[in-house]
Every structure is written in structure tokens, then in C-alpha cells.
């Protein structure tokens, strides 16, 4: 469907499609105030600004209820819990059971299910993410989960409007890359938290695990621009080296950096068991 074809739908049909993209009544209502949309770019811009500026915790939580549980044994086994969660298709029975338990623990702690944009992620990676995020506070998880929902929303836009032009979408404003200089290879499966100061306390606003190339290409949702400020990237190098039975002098690496505008910022880490360095990448 093209955007032009979508704009010809009735308001009821258009709203239903939006609800399928993001299950927040407030978000859909605010989006429909601008229907029909002028362009794909306007649609994405509105989706982002409405989500972050005109929705609140109750709206975010409502959207979470429209997702199946990634860790639900039955849905994992029978349906693999939806298209965005296709990465769990190769999961072993043990991994599925572990996901089920971790998801239950997560829901019991935070009061909503684990939300993650699972496209391209393996079941093992999702389990690692889930276990890592279980250590966060409720405030942190709300920030992270709403960001994951926004990623999912944009993916669903593309699936809804298959003939539309989304070429304008850029990569995450903040990206990272880890290189293990001891072996000259990417640092894969390293848990990374991105944090900002809120009321004088560092809180996680995005979280991920480096892929086989040592990168997290989707740390933030596309078109999500952070306000110019000081941020921090926290790398769990201790667990990375522990998995390899290697002792490291640096169990955790923290890199603070400034953003000044809406430009792309790349924060790489070059690390070995006894030293590390960073620079502003491109």
C-alpha cells in the first residue's frame, strides 16, 4: 500500500491500522488529528513527537498490553510470538523455558511484559537482554520499553505501507562499536547501557548487546533525537571476558560524551584486558 492509498481509507480503517502499529489509544487519537498525512516523513515525525511528548506512562503501558509475551512457552513453541519476534524460531527447549521464567520474573517486578524490538535478534540474545534489564529500575525500564515500542512502530509502518518511501530514515543518532584489540576482532555479546542524568542520577534510557560485528545499530529508534546534553555509555567488559575465562583489569568501562545538535554520534570502544581507548567516530 502507498501512503496515497492509505490516505483514501476511512478514518475508522486508518485508525485501526495505526492501532495495529502502536496499541495506545492516545497515540492513535493524536495521530489521527493529522490524517490524511502529507508525507511518510511527516507521519514518522508525528509518530515520534506524539509518542515522546504527548503520551504518558499510562499510554505507554497500554501499548505494551497489545504485545504477546516473548517468554511465553506456548506462544514461543506454537507461533514464535509474532513477526517481530522471529529470532526465537531457532530457540532450544531450554532457552524457551529460560525465556518463560525470566519473562514471568520481569512482569512480576515491573508490572508489564518485556518489550523488545526482536527483529534480527536470536533467542539467546533476547534472553541475555531480558536478564540484564531485570536489574533496572521501573523508571529505567519504562524509558527503554517505550523506545523499543517506537522501533516496533516504525517497522510496522514499513510493513503496512510496503510501497511507501522510507529512504529518509537514518540510523540511530547514537551508535557504538567495540573492538577487542587483544585479538583484533569485534567484541560481540557485550551488554551496553546508554544513560542520561535525571534529577542528578544516572538512569539507563537505552540498552542492547553488541552483535557479531561488535555493533548495536539500533540503540535508539530511528528519528529519535536526544536533546543536547551529557550522556554516558556503560560497557559490561567484565562479563565479556569472564565468558572467555580471561581476567580483566577493567570489569566495567564508562564513557561520558556530549551531544551538541541532531548530528549522528558514534562512540566506539577499543578494549583489551589491560587497557581501553575511545574517540569520536563517524
Placement of each model-derived feature along the sequence:
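Residue-level signal for inorganic ion chemistry
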Residues: 31, 114, 267
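Aromatic-anchored, charged helix-turn/loop surface patch used as a conserved interaction hotspot
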Residues: 1-10, 16-21, 26-102, 152-160, ...
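Short, loop-centered acidic/histidine patches that primarily coordinate divalent metals
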Residues: 115-121, 236-238, 272
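C-terminal non-catalytic interaction appendages of large macromolecular assemblies
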Residues: 89-161
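Alpha-helix boundary/capping and short turn/kink residues
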Residues: 24, 36-40, 120-123, 135-139, ...
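Compositionally biased low-complexity segments at domain edges in trafficked proteins
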Residues: 263-282
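A general structural signal for short secondary-structure boundary/capping elements
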Residues: 114, 160-167, 278-282
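Beta-strand-dominated extracellular/periplasmic modules and repeats
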Residues: 166-260, 266
Amino acid at each position: 500500500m502507498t501512503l496515497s492509498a492509505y490516505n483514501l481509507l476511512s478514518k475508522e480503517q486508518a485508525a485501526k491500522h495505526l492501532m495495529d502499529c502502536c496499541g495506545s489509544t492516545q497515540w492513535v487519537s493524536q495521530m489521527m488529528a493529522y490524517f490524511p498525512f502529507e508525507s511518510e516523513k511527516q507521519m514518522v515525525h508525528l509518530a515520534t513527537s506524539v509518542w515522546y511528548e504527548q503520551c504518558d506512562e499510562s499510554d505507554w503501558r497500554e501499548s505494551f498490553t497489545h504485545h504477546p509475551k516473548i517468554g511465553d512457552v506456548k506462544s514461543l513453541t506454537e507461533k514464535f510470538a509474532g513477526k517481530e519476534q522471529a529470532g526465537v524460531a531457532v530457540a532450544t527447549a531450554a532457552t524457551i523455558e529460560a525465556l518463560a521464567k525470566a519473562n514471568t520474573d520481569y512482569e512480576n517486578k515491573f508490572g508489564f511484559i518485556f518489550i523488545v524490538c526482536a527483529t534480527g535478534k536470536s533467542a539467546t540474545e533476547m534472553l541475555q537482554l531480558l536478564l540484564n534489564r531485570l536489574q533496572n529500575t521501573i523508571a529505567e525500564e519504562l524509558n527503554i520499553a517505550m523506545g523499543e515500542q517506537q522501533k516496533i512502530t516504525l517497522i510496522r509502518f514499513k510493513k503496512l505501507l510496503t510501497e511507501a518511501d522510507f529512504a529518509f530514515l537514518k540510523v540511530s543518532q547514537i551508535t557504538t562499536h567495540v573492538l577487542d584489540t587483544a585479538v583484533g576482532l569485534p567484541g560481540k555479546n557485550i551488554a551496553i547501557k546508554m544513560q542520561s542524568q535525571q534529577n542528578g542520577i544516572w538512569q539507563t534510557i537505552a540498552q542492547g548487546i553488541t552483535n557479531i560485528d561488535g555493533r548495536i545499530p539500533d540503540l535508539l529508534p530511528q528519528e529519535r533525537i536526544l536533546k543536547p546534553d551529557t550522556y554516558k555509555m556503560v560497557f559490561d567488559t567484565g562479563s565479556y571476558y569472564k565468558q572467555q575465562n580471561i581476567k580483566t583489569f577493567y570489569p566495567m568501562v564508562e564513557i561520558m560524551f556530549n551531544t551538541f545538535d541532531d548530528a549522528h554520534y558514534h562512540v566506539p570502544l577499543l578494549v583489551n584486558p589491560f587497557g581501553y581507548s575511545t574517540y569520536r567516530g563517524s
